[in-house]
Regions:
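Active-site-proximal alpha-helical scaffold in enzymes
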Residues: 85-116
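Conserved "HGTGT" condensation-loop signature of ketosynthase/thiolase-family condensing enzymes
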Residues: 1-80, 114-151
Length: 151
């Protein structure tokens, strides 16, 4: 079996409400991180086969297959694929798992997992939530902070 390994990690600063990062597009922020990762690891962009991006609310500035846009903005070749995974708070971890699985099955040799969330551009629940009444009555739709407290 082929083993997958993580050869590098990079992250952006965490923004605060009305802080200095207000107005930076999530795709620009993610592509800066990917460019920094490529620089840090000295990986040639042509060696990257795929990019999977985790995002809990892929709409608005985070929509329209943001992963492919991030790949292009990062300087990866147009041949590099891009997909978005939504597992809410687990989205980025799922992106790591997907890249790892694709490497271990021999589907790709190298991939990048990235996550991004612009909590100021996209409101909790998205732009047009339509919650199921029965689930809403049971308080099914709560944030991860509240969920963690309950668990």
């Amino acid at each position: 079996m082929i083993e997958s390994v993580i050869i590098g990690a990079k992250r952006s600063p965490i923004g605060i409400k009305n802080g200095k990062m207000v107005g930076i597009r999530p795709d620009d922020l993610a592509s800066q991180v990917v460019r920094g990762l490529l620089e840090k690891t000295k990986v040639e962009p042509s060696h990257v086969d795929d990019l999977v991006l985790g995002c809990a609310f892929p709409e608005g500035p985070q929509g329209m297959l943001m992963a492919k846009g991030v790949a292009i903005l990062s300087g990866l070749p147009e041949t590099v694929g891009g997909s978005v995974v939504n597992r809410f708070c687990g989205s980025s971890m799922d992106a790591v798992h997907q890249i790892s699985s694709r490497i271990e099955t021999g589907d790709i040799e190298m991939g990048i997992a990235v996550g991004v969330e612009d909590m100021f551009s996209v409101p909790m629940g998205g732009f047009n939530p339509d919650f199921h009444p029965e689930l809403a009555e049971q308080e099914y739709y709560i944030g991860m902070g509240e969920t963690a407290e309950i668990l």
